[in-house]
């Protein structure tokens, strides 16, 4: 089975970019919520 490097990179980016975007949004939401509590 031949692995296509470009396909592998594209798949990795396709998974990593939305995941990191959601993580950043989540962290910002939690941080702002903690600031509002104080």
Swiss-Prot record:
Subcellular location as annotated: Plastid, Cyanelle thylakoid membrane
Signal peptide: none
GO biological process: photosynthesis, light reaction
Cellular component, GO annotation: cyanelle thylakoid membrane; photosystem II
Bilayer-crossing regions: 5-25
Pfam families reported in the protein's UniProt record: PsbM
Membrane topology: Single-pass membrane protein
Family of this protein: Belongs to the PsbM family.
Subunit and interaction comment: PSII is composed of 1 copy each of membrane proteins PsbA, PsbB, PsbC, PsbD, PsbE, PsbF, PsbH, PsbI, PsbJ, PsbK, PsbL, PsbM, PsbT, PsbX, PsbY, PsbZ, Psb30/Ycf12, at least 3 peripheral proteins of the oxygen-evolving complex and a large number of cofactors. It forms dimeric complexes.
Matches recorded under NCBIfam families: PS_II_psbM
Name of the protein: Photosystem II reaction center protein M
Annotated organism of origin: Cyanophora paradoxa
């Amino acid at each position: 089975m031949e692995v296509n490097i470009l396909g592998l990179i594209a798949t990795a980016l396709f998974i990593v970019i939305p995941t990191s975007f959601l993580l950043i949004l989540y962290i910002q939401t939690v941080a702002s919520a903690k600031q509002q509590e104080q």
